[in-house]
From Swiss-Prot:
Belongs to the universal ribosomal protein uL22 family. GO terms for molecular function: rRNA binding; structural constituent of ribosome. The keyword RNA-binding applies. It comes from Borrelia duttonii (strain Ly). It comes from the Bacteria. This is Large ribosomal subunit protein uL22. This protein binds specifically to 23S rRNA; its binding is stimulated by other ribosomal proteins, e.g. L4, L17, and L20. It is important during the early stages of 50S assembly. It makes multiple contacts with different domains of the 23S rRNA in the assembled 50S subunit and ribosome. The globular domain of the protein is located near the polypeptide exit tunnel on the outside of the subunit, while an extended beta-hairpin is found that lines the wall of the exit tunnel in the center of the 70S ribosome. One of its GO terms (biological process) is translation. The lineage of its organism: Bacteria, Pseudomonadati, Spirochaetota, Spirochaetia, Spirochaetales. Residues 1-25 are annotated as: Disordered. Pfam families: Ribosomal_L22.
Length: 120
């Protein structure tokens, strides 16, 4: 019998634009945990570092709840990157004008599952 259990982790209001993190998330979706972490560690992006922390947290949650689980049995199932809070501020310009500055953040949701063969 094929057994699947899901474990999740969330990162809220992480200081990076969702537009920059989503392409990185597409690279690791559906991959084994060890391969996903290797991909994220080799990327120079700030978003890869943030995403790596959330993926490691989800794997830690899985290994905490199931002591017999090893890293080889964990696969990344779902990675969602959503908009977080936007911090708006004013940027003074020439001739008394002002531009609006928007600092974006993102929420990252990662779901990993264990893949193992169990009894009936």
């Amino acid at each position: 019998m094929f057994v699947n259990k899901k474990y999740t982790a969330k990162g809220k209001n992480l200081p990076s634009s969702p537009k920059k993190v989503r392409p990185i998330a597409d690279n690791i979706r559906g991959k084994p945990y060890n391969e996903a972490v290797a991909i994220l560690c080799s990327m120079p992006n700030k978003g890869a570092k943030l995403l790596g922390k959330v993926v490691k947290s989800a794997a830690s949650n899985a290994m905490y709840h199931n002591r017999n689980l090893s890293e080889d049995m964990i696969f990344v199932k779902t990675v969602m990157v959503d908009d977080g809070r936007k911090r708006r501020s004013i940027w003074p310009r020439a001739r008394g004008r002002a531009d609006r500055l928007i600092n974006r953040s993102c929420h990252i949701f990662v779901e990993v599952y264990e893949k193992m063969y169990g009894g009936e």
